[in-house]
């Protein structure tokens, strides 16, 4: 990934984090990396642990379309690993996608995996 893409990705993640905070989420971690995948944002709201994949781009081709089955599987594995490593005691967990669009719009898609 080139420097420009990394910079944009970080910008999208920052905007998504601010959005989540305004919605009452507490950010627990960002950019949790494992050999098989990365969790962009780990947050909690109440008793729910939320793993968030952030995608940014043009509204003409929704960024969520870049989250395919293989990507979802890697995210699920990373989420399971995070839970195992840090043993948080949450009643629920879920996998979300946040789209940060070039027109300024932010879409929060909740519960996108097989969770």
Swiss-Prot record:
<dbReference type="InterPro" id="IPR011856">
    <property type="entry name" value="tRNA_endonuc-like_dom_sf"/>
</dbReference>
<dbReference type="GO" id="GO:0003676">
    <property type="term" value="F:nucleic acid binding"/>
</dbReference>
<dbReference type="InterPro" id="IPR003509">
    <property type="entry name" value="UPF0102_YraN-like"/>
</dbReference>
<dbReference type="InterPro" id="IPR011335">
    <property type="entry name" value="Restrct_endonuc-II-like"/>
</dbReference>
<protein>
    <recommendedName>
        <fullName>UPF0102 protein Kole_1919</fullName>
    </recommendedName>
</protein>
<dbReference type="Pfam" id="PF02021">
    <property type="entry name" value="UPF0102"/>
</dbReference>
<comment type="similarity">
    <text>Belongs to the UPF0102 family.</text>
</comment>
